[in-house]
């Protein structure tokens, strides 16, 4: 039996930005035999940082399901995708350049602030992110984050233009027609080729809902409600349930 767990990072695995609190959680999941899949709105660069710090070497999903990064040779069969460094990448979203092209048309009308038109200092202020992590968050490939706006209505304009606007733990994300569930389903199908699987997901926000729909058991940290997810106060509670 292959046991998989899809983990959101922000406010689910890690309360802030420091990886140390997550280390014992990851170790316990490894001891239970889990394949740990990060499924986050964070960029590839950010996730590579946390993967290194937490010693996680499995595939991962970036920017709200926009891309799946599979280490070369991870599966004992060919995976079709784009070769990028040491990964095979399955792209499900659209490039950030296209998103920013649209945001540029709207930023003055609606007072939008996002990564592409903000300084490092502004981003640090908006997010509370440590200065050394800001450049990693700025390495966006498939999405943009809306930090603030002065007028409502921009969401409707973007949706009418074919983009998706998704609420995360703190900010809205603009991306293509991708979500965490579609990406997770693709990985689940790969793992099913290896044998019987048992799948879990843990998240805390609306953008995690599609991920909950494709797994056997889901958990939501906090008070949001989802028909398929069990509410827990923290990821520590999840460990007790899935032992």
Swiss-Prot record:
Q: Where does it sit, as one GO cellular component term?
A: cytosol
Broad enzyme group: hydrolase
According to the lineage, what is the superkingdom?
Answer: Archaea
Which biological process, per GO, is one annotated for this protein? mannosylglycerate biosynthetic process
Task: Indicate whether Chaperone appears among the record's keywords.
Answer: no
Which SUPFAM superfamilies does this entry report, sorted A to Z? HAD-like
One Pfam family, please name it: Hydrolase_3
Where in the cell is the protein located? Cytoplasm
What pathway is this protein a component of? Carbohydrate biosynthesis; 2-(alpha-D-mannosyl)-D-glycerate biosynthesis; 2-(alpha-D-mannosyl)-D-glycerate from GDP-alpha-D-mannose (MPG route): step 2/2
Task: Read off the NCBIfam families from this record.
Answer: HAD-SF-IIB (TIGR01484), HAD-SF-IIB-MPGP (TIGR01486), osmo_MPG_phos (TIGR02461)
Q: Which family does it belong to?
A: Belongs to the HAD-like hydrolase superfamily. MPGP family.
Protein's name according to its UniProt entry: Mannosyl-3-phosphoglycerate phosphatase
Q: What organism does the UniProt record list as the source?
A: Pyrococcus horikoshii (strain ATCC 700860 / DSM 12428 / JCM 9974 / NBRC 100139 / OT-3)
Q: What is the lineage of its organism?
A: Archaea, Methanobacteriati, Methanobacteriota, Thermococci, Thermococcales
